[in-house]
Amino acid sequence: MNFNYFILVLFFITSGHAKSETREVHQEAENHIKRGSNTGFNFKTLDKEKRSAEEQNLAEHLVTRGSNKGFNFMVDMINALSNGKRSAEEQDLAEHLVTRGSNKGFNFMVDMINALSNGKRSAEEQDLAEDLVTRGSNKGFNFMVDMIQALSKGKRSAEDQDLAEDLVTRGSNKGFNFMVDMIQALSNGKRSAEEQDLAEHLVTRGSNKGFNFMVDMINALSNGKRSAEEQDLSEDLVTRGSNKGFNFMVDMINALSNGKRSAEEQDLVEDLVTRRSNKGFNFMVDMIQALSKGKRSAEQEKDMK
């Protein structure tokens, strides 16, 4: 009898402890969202047990839906879901991105989507960020359209502008379909007519003014719109030689200028292009190489259509 009573007491204690841990987990997630400094790696909040039901539904929707296969890059980056589709080295890198407390630079995704650092942007930018989070139509995908659109030609140098125009207009760059795939997502019915018109406009027009999001993220050209701390971080991302994991962003901008990276990094990029596995990781191939159709398999090309 005493033993049964002891077991019952132990059950209630452990049950209460589990509930306490759950509350702590959710509180940690809420703290990630609410805090203004946003110095931590906020993708931790996207773990299944650490997000709200609404966020979980969105995440599961991104994973399970059959269309818009190209959008799986988001799942790969956030959750490091590799299940045999990437090498051990890549898996270690992915897990490292998720688990480590540093890597402040990778917060750009959280900042842009969830508008976490309110004090670090202008009122106009804050309104845009809040709109991305709160509006009801296609919440998950609008950040891409707005990020790409929202800026003007006058905010970058002539050299940057030439690069952006070249990416859109040159005929050789067939592999740069990531822009088409991410914007259009091959599922027109999932956005409003206005958004669809914008997406088609981004694909067909020659000026491609909307490509400024990339320049702004990396080169911090609109200095007046961010704090000194953010400006230093942006410049640091471009100039520093460390933090190899974040070099994919620099690689996307500089389009494989071999002299601008180490041999090790170059080998990694070439490996991403040549191997046939890890289809979900094709966003990296597309964004880094931005090269020709011949560098992917027929099956991969079919997935992009």
From Swiss-Prot:
Q: Which residues form the signal peptide?
A: 1-18
User: Which domain of life does this protein belong to?
Assistant: Eukaryota
Where it mainly occurs, coarsely classed, is secreted
Propeptide segment residues: 19-35, 52-65, 87-100, 122-135, 157-170, 192-205, 227-240, 262-275, 297-305
List where in the cell it is found: Secreted
Q: Which UniProt keywords apply?
A: Amidation, Antibiotic, Antimicrobial, Cleavage on pair of basic residues, Secreted, Signal
GO process annotations (BP): defense response to bacterium
Provide the positions where the record notes the PTM Lysine amide: 153, 293
Tissue expression summary:
Expressed by the skin dorsal glands.
Asparagine amide carried by residues? 83, 118, 188, 223, 258
State the GO CC annotations. extracellular region
- Family of this protein: Belongs to the maximin-S family.
State its role. Maximin-S1 has no antimicrobial activity. Has no hemolytic activity.
Can you say what this protein is called?
Maximins-S type B/C
Look up and give the organism this protein is from.
Bombina maxima (Giant fire-bellied toad)
Q: What is the lineage of its organism?
A: Eukaryota, Metazoa, Chordata, Craniata, Vertebrata
